[in-house]
């Protein structure tokens, strides 16, 4: 699948996910997102089939961005956990090797945390 096609799917999916996150309890999202991030951080789970890979990356981005959003809105941000999320996202992006997808994450909500995780 082309980069533009993947970015289109991300751009379509993430706003819907963030809307749904607003109705989820914070502890449930936090628990699920960290378990999912730890699981997806393992290279062995990132498979070579494009569709499955796309679904894993899309889910990872959506959960992490949704979690960052809720933590920042609630004012309960823990810098260590935010840094962990940012580093995990960047590791997945680096492994996939698509630098264009990295710009999709640079929304105002998490730009600072990503820049803290990896200096320019």
UniProtKB/Swiss-Prot annotation:
Where is it chiefly localized?
membrane
Where are the Extracellular topological domains?
23-59
Is Transmembrane helix given among the entry's keywords? Answer: yes
Segments in the Cytoplasmic topological domain = 81-120
Q: What membrane topology is annotated for this entry?
A: Single-pass membrane protein
> Per the record, what is one GO cellular component?
membrane
Its annotated compartments are: Membrane
Q: Which cysteines are joined by disulfide bonds?
A: none
Record protein name field: Uncharacterized protein C1F8.08
Native source species? Schizosaccharomyces pombe (strain 972 / ATCC 24843) (Fission yeast)
**Lineage, broadest ranks:** Eukaryota, Fungi, Dikarya, Ascomycota, Taphrinomycotina
């Amino acid at each position: 699948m082309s980069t533009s096609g993947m970015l289109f799917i991300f751009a379509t999916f993430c706003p819907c996910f963030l809307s749904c996150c607003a109705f989820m309890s914070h502890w449930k999202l936090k628990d699920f997102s960290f378990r999912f991030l730890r699981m997806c951080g393992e290279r062995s789970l990132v498979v070579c089939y494009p569709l499955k890979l796309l679904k894993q990356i899309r889910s990872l981005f959506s959960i992490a961005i949704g979690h960052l959003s809720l933590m920042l809105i609630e004012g309960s941000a823990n810098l260590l956990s935010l840094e962990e999320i940012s580093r995990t996202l960047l590791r997945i992006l680096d492994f996939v090797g698509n630098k264009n997808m990295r710009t999709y994450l640079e929304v105002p909500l998490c730009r600072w945390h990503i820049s803290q995780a990896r200096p320019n």
